[in-house]
Amino acid sequence: MLDEPLFNVSWILGRFCNYSCSYCWPYANSNVPDHQDFEVYTTAIDEIKRQARANGFTEFHFSFSGGEPTAYKKFGDLVEYYANDYEAKYQSIHLTTNLSPGEKWWGRFIDNTSHLTRRSITASYHAEFANEKDFGDRCVQLIEGGVFVTINQVMVPEHFEEYYERCSRFADKGINVTLKPQSDPTASRIVDGYTDQQIDQLQTGFPQNWKGEQIMQMYLEDAKGNDYGLDQAERMNAFGFNKFKNWTCNAGYQSCIIRGVEVKRAYSCADEPLGTLTDGFTLFKAPSKCITSSCVSSADSKIPKVLHEG
């Protein structure tokens, strides 16, 4: 987002999920379908791109999550609609998914997104429901199809060692792994219960690689102009670097989040929404001050921010 005129959308399609994990926040999943009509979604894509282009952002990254996004019956069609925009010279897509669909579904996803600049997936492994071998096979299928995959493992403190060992087995197969600290039910802080060694593992474990080389997905620049690379946004939470109140932030101007029908500037910000998918929304025309005391969502923390001294 620093190098390209890229507009970022983080989209929770709904809370409907085919899993019900014991550690999931109660408000983050539902067994009742809550998706909107297909035309509501396609109209939103078109309107976001129109307003973003008016702000000078001509390239796009859309990230879909839930709930479980693939549980939406027309999600494959929605991905195809988004991907078939040949006006944008750069388009990328990201999914956060439990990989529950079968090989055929993912084959269609690979084919329908093959022309995009970048495709990536956060594959959330949930030990209460997933089969380790089948899950690994889907990851390998996607990687061989040119999709950047990282397994996301919520590191529940009381199961830390078990989960770490399984993540090591995935890493041995050449699959990237992200160790995600568990947040409290309000999603405002990391839970207690981690040892110092476990904190170190969260901060440094499993560097991200692509085609045999370590990659950096975020950059920080200090007041002296020194650059620091991070291979994944979750490192910021692991290090506790997530307090940006009064920084100037591009959220709402170069990005937006969609949660249900609400369009907001960020997950962590508690101000009024920018609008809704059904009644309309308006993006900011310029960067604005951060208003939240803690920014624990990686979707928020990766948006460009500047701290002006004085």
Describe each PLM feature range.
Residues S188-G310:
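Accessory C-terminal segments flanking Radical SAM cores
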